[in-house]
């Protein structure tokens, strides 16, 4: 048996198929990735269909779409776009799409959208809203501000709509997927934690991507439960998640500078080198 100590990274997320870039980035750094699903996603197409059915020629009345989740892109690709006519599909893919983070931006481009904005320049919803406001203030097609179609999950934050509404920009939110917490999520997490042999593992990293499904896990990770000398470390995908952890007495040892695999794993690797 190799005496080399391992660095395991427990990713509190569903594994993206066919390729998960967090897994690839972990393995490129000789970290062992372990996925711990906490929620399940279900496509929702009825809201989108209702808009198309009740507003004549709707896709030709808008110029902009907001997408902030890869789950929305999956729902578009797997459940919504296949139901569209060729004309509707062409109209949809011709829109300018605003999004958060490079991973989602790349996914959107692979789906056939050509004009994608935000992406790596927008690390969170607040920054993306500022980009949209700035763009629309100089876009003659948006004067007066046209309605933006915001494709969302059943559970979402209201940062973007609030900022846009404050500037008189209309936003129509349409649900494209819903999420449910897995009843055995905490059990999966504990099982993953107990799999390690402390003589071999140099450290375990728990990466938190979202508050959903993490109530019991945050209690487990709470500062009061982390003993001095513990090999357990916590990373958050960004400042919003860090605040959630702070509010639940969980210290983030690392906060990813950007919500993407390379930024996250580079930050963890840097921490490992200096600790």
Swiss-Prot record:
Its EC number is 4.2.1.75. Pathway: Porphyrin-containing compound metabolism; protoporphyrin-IX biosynthesis; coproporphyrinogen-III from 5-aminolevulinate: step 3/4. One of its GO terms (molecular function) is uroporphyrinogen-III synthase activity. It is an enzyme of class 4 (lyase). GO terms for biological process: heme biosynthetic process; protoporphyrinogen IX biosynthetic process; uroporphyrinogen III biosynthetic process. The keyword Lyase applies. Keywords: Heme biosynthesis, Lyase, Porphyrin biosynthesis. It comes from the Eukaryota. One of its GO terms (cellular component) is cytosol. The keyword Lyase applies. Gene3D superfamilies: 3.40.50.10090. It catalyses: hydroxymethylbilane = uroporphyrinogen III + H2O. Catalyzes cyclization of the linear tetrapyrrole, hydroxymethylbilane, to the macrocyclic uroporphyrinogen III, the fourth step in the heme biosynthetic pathway. Belongs to the uroporphyrinogen-III synthase family. Present with 1360 molecules/cell in log phase SD medium. This is Uroporphyrinogen-III synthase. The gene is HEM4.
